Amino acid sequence: MQLGIVTLFPEMFAAVTDHGISGRAVRLGLMNLELFNPRDYTTDKHRTVDDKPFGGGPGMLMKTEPLIASITAAREAVSQKQTIGEKARVIYLSPQGQTLKQGSIIDLAKREG
């Protein structure tokens, strides 16, 4: 299984890759996890990924450019390592999306590609 994960906090994934069942899967080569930090795809010296909300108000948004670039890089990296003809699937977790539950994960695991 090839996984490309876009995250601002790549260091927190050491717990996933170094321990437990997922760590064993990585060590046995059953799962390959590659991390992509949107800060690596910025163009300013401060590696800025935050943007202000349009129309004012509280909160912060992510800049689209580094987010799109990191998703594209992750998708290309995963696609290169998959079987010919398989296309990398993008799963974007967002507060506006559906709640990710065990049943959804089982359904995703059953899909091809």
Predicted regions mapped to residue ranges:
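S-adenosyl-L-methionine/SAH cofactor-binding core of RNA-modifying enzymes
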Residues: 61-113
